[in-house]
Amino acid sequence: LTLGPAATVQQACQRMWERRVGAAMVMEGSRLVGVFTGRDAVHALAKGLNPVDTPLASVMTRNPHTISPDATAIDALRQMSDCGYRHLPILDGDRLVGIVSRGDFQGLELDKLEEETGLWERIC
């Protein structure tokens, strides 16, 4: 889900609800400028902002941390843990190619992650 920075919190929440996703990538043209999440919506409401006329640009996470398509699951989980994020945009150069969330790792077997970590450490 991508939206422009002028989209409102209400519009973003509606689209996120329709698509059953927890985040929207905020784009200016083809450039990622931020991430808007359900947590950002709660924060905006807690501050007393009106979701009908509050633009995403004023409440989104600017210049979000990103990962590349060749990052490992461990890399993504470590970065989410270190930064306190639940969602990470995936950029190939400057082009948004996807998003990964903590939920994507639910049900992933710990053994498989440990296997990947061991392999990664042997490569490096």
Provide a role label for each language-model segment:
Residues 1, 31-32, 64-65:
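Short active-site oxyanion
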Residues 2-20, 27, 67-84, 91, ...:
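The conserved cystathionine-beta-synthase
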Residues 4, 8, 17, 33, ...:
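Alpha-helix N-cap/loop-to-helix boundary motif
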Residues 8, 24, 48-50, 92-94, ...:
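Residue-level detector of solvent-exposed, low-hydrophobicity positions
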Residues 16-19, 24-40, 80, 88-104:
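A glycine-centered beta-loop-beta connector
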Residues 37-81, 99-124:
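Tandem CBS (Bateman) regulatory domains
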